[in-house]
Amino acid sequence: MMTQGPNLIGIHTNTKENEETQKFVNWFLNTSLTWDNNESKTPAQYFTESASYILPLKETFTGSNNKGQSGKNDGKNSNNTFKAKALELFKEQSENKIVGYSDPSDFRGGKFRESIGSAFNATVNSHVDFNTFVANFRANLGSGYDK
């Protein structure tokens, strides 16, 4: 399974910036605010609903303390079939039933995703086997990925 989304990458710089990053994460996950529709929810809950995003927290999959998801839009109770399926796959990943892959935060990430799409489209349209799919994918990536 390919995973993708906003990432919070912690990079140690200095004590002051580390503390400010911790304050932001605490605010994002734990501070309840009133939003446009007069509902009270955390910024994480607002973000997940607005972006149809699944916040990868333990609570999302166990149902306890639901910091990142608010009930009506958590994927389980959503009319969004894609989000419900994604939640199911993430749950399987959290139980080590499947392996997730996330491309590294790198300037080449877009090229990598575009190459997967191109190779997949070529495979679907021409009914080629898996080995041909991989060969097409590698060809689309170019020599910069050959390591």
Swiss-Prot record:
Cross-referenced InterPro entries: Lipoprotein_10_C
Protein name from the UniProt record: Uncharacterized lipoprotein MPN_098
Any one Pfam family match given in the protein's UniProt record, by short name: Lipoprotein_10
Entry similarity comment: Belongs to the MG185/MG260 family.
Lineage: Bacteria, Bacillati, Mycoplasmatota, Mycoplasmoidales, Mycoplasmoidaceae
